Amino acid sequence: MSTLAPAELVERIWERDPSVWTGHDEAQWLGWLDEPARMRERVDELVEFVSGIDVDDVVLLGMGGSSLAPEVMRRVFRAERFHVLDTTHPTAIRRLEESIDVERTLFIAASKSGTTLETRSQTDYFRDKGGRFAVITDPGSPLAELSKDVFYGEPTIGGRYSALSVFGILPAVSMGIDVVRLLDRAEEMREGCRLEVGNPGLDLGRRLAETTLLRVAGDFGLWIEQLVAESTGKGGNGIVPVWRGGDPADVRLPDPYELGQEFFRWEFATAVAGSLLGINPFDQPDVHAAKDKTNALLSSRGRVPGTELGPEGSLDELLAAATPEDYVAILAFVDPAREPELEPFVRRAEATGAAVAVGLGPRYLHSTGQLHKGGPDTGLFVQVVDDFGDDLKIPGQAYGFKTLIACQALGDFETLRDRGRRIVRVQL
């Protein structure tokens, strides 16, 4: 845990000193500190590309850090013809496909590694339908081979810190957002986060480090949830974002363009909180466990996932064990359009007096999944599944989206159970 004076902590962060955190590879992941100015230099390139295409809709295919900032901007700026697909549920994919003219749509496949299972599956599906593609990825990624329109990210920026990089700014341009104005606001906050006194990022980070349960609300909460949970939830510790209960998150959005400031303020604050908590806020050591389990299930081609459901009594027993220090996480592998149907589970969880979080799968695997496995053992997990709808074939694979999401759900269930987490599985 850092014992540096606040002014020295700020100075050392800007000096890229990894000893501020754990002294390992943190200095390799600080490209976000300078990204607002770098992106200003790329604006003309991005605007020229978007203005040169004639489409009716834009669909972003991505997960986690590659999709959540665009999703927040889509909601805040009310970009009706911009869509984010961050699910593998076949019903949701089919509904999106039926709502657009694929040949009049630009698909943006976004993945830093280029190997994200969900993004590659979605990309293969819509490329087979004849859609036009652009790619956002890091240098050396296999995804770059799929399009002539490739926009490379900065390799020294992790996914959850990439809101103000090309992963956020190209989608913003395609929504018609004035990205110069957005980046100018971010640059103003960047300068504010250099101050020794009255530093907005430092002040927020110090408060975060003293927070156990952080209530995230509204559209911006989706992005905060990933940033905070994945950055701090490790080594048995972490700040737990919740929907009901907890201390309210400090979010300032008097107008939509304040998103530029807030993205940077929260990134800097999370880095500060990581230092004060004595953790590396830029790694995610437990994320791959559920991915590995999913891949093993897909490879086995044995049992059909989705049949191992707990009796109703199991849910009652789980919730009866909740204490005010715990949180209940509703982990729902369901069609996102059915999210309102989760409310009865939320109300039952609230009745225990514990804080409540809700995550849609597989989105949450790239968001709060790290916290669930590596964070404090105060979570009670209720995995909710539906019947996954009618299947859609994934080109080049022996399985379709129905099997994929079923394996993702079962893979996460088994990973949490194997780690001794308290979890039950119920049908919606």
List where the protein language model places each region.
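A structural signal for isolated positions on well-ordered beta-strands in alpha/beta enzyme cores
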Residues: V59, H83, L106-F107, A134, ...
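Structural alpha-beta junctions
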Residues: E80, K129-R132, D149, S231-V240, ...
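Glycine-rich phosphate-binding loops that contact phosphosugars or nucleotide phosphates
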Residues: S51-R194, G246-E258
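Alpha-helix C-terminal capping segments
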Residues: H24, V50-D54, F77, F126-K129, ...
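C-terminal amphipathic alpha-helical interaction region
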Residues: A320-E325, L360-P362, K402, C407, ...
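Low-complexity, highly charged intrinsically disordered N-terminal segments
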Residues: M1-V58, L68
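Catalytic-loop motifs flanking and including active-site residues across diverse enzymes
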Residues: A69, S162-V166, I224, F264-F268, ...
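Acidic catalytic cores of enzymes that act on phosphate-bearing nucleotides/polynucleotides
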Residues: D25, W32, P36-M39, A92, ...
